[in-house]
Amino acid sequence: MEVYLASAAGLLSWCGKWRKIPTPLAHPTLLAACGTDVALADSVNRLLYRQGRISTLPPGVKVLRCWRNQLLTLSSETNCLTLYDAHDYPLVTSPAGIRPCGCAVVDCQVIVCGCEDGCLHIFSLPDLREIAAYPVPGCPMRVAADGGVLTCLSLLSPDSPQTLLFRLCLTSGDFAPVALLPGWCGAVTIADDHTIWAGVGEQLLHFPLDSVVPDVQLGGFGLIRFLSCQQSKLLISDPWAGHCLLMDTTPPSAPRQLYAGECGGCCFASCRKGTLPDWKASLNEP
């Protein structure tokens, strides 16, 4: 199991030990694992790096996603979703909400959090044709998909921030609120056992299947922006607090600091040696 992290130190990888992966992007902010490849973005300087190529990104890119060997970007400045081919040439662009800031890919569909337009938008791939839009409470900002069921974080009140965690079935349109939580929307992901991990405000929460009460509730975070779950490991990137952490989820244990410093996107990828990192070893930043 290998971990990728976009950081102020560049693109970092952990697979038994830390190493820096040479790239021309000095300060990457977003990444996406595309099979054995990693797409890397510097959203501040509007640069994309993949397979040895540097391309220009639209302004305001908030999300980078892979679909097959192609790439998706979502911009909160242009309010557009864009699909790129295997050589990073833009194929098609579609309007998607107002200040959109979250999306998820499910088979041949991409779900976009329309944010200020109050809708979850469903687009078909590869033509990016909008096939449905579901009005939801508040401003939907984060979404994760588990088959045909979406799990979403929506901001209800920016003045005294409250976030609604809910589920939505794509086939029936059924809406099911899970919890109303204090704080800003951070991140949400679905574990292999179909349970929910969510970062809201200064908290990390876990909701068992079909439960509206969290069985894990950890505090002390800044604002978790990226979550990635694989097997019994949860990878956490908290840019506000300036660290990346990893925790065991079965049973849940206290998160271990994996990296200290300015950080952005993170994800798991297959480790070439097929070995798990020794998390009891020294976890100093590289």
Feature locations, PLM:
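Eukaryotic tandem repeat interaction scaffolds
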Residues: 138-146, 150-218, 222
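An edge-strand/N-cap motif at the start of beta-rich repeat modules
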Residues: 1-24, 29-33
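Conserved beta-strand positions in repeat-built beta-propeller and related beta-rich domains
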Residues: 5-9, 40-45, 73-77, 112-117, ...
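Blade-level signature of beta-propeller repeat domains, shared across WD40, Kelch, NHL, RCC1
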Residues: 237-286
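Conserved core beta-strand positions within WD40 beta-propeller blades
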Residues: 2, 37, 70-71, 109-111, ...
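A short beta-strand motif characteristic of beta-propeller blades
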Residues: 17-23, 52-57, 88-95, 129-134, ...
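Structural motif
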Residues: 10-13, 46-49, 79-83, 118-122, ...
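Repeated scaffold domains used in trafficking and secretory/extracellular systems
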Residues: 26-35, 59-68, 98-106, 138-146, ...
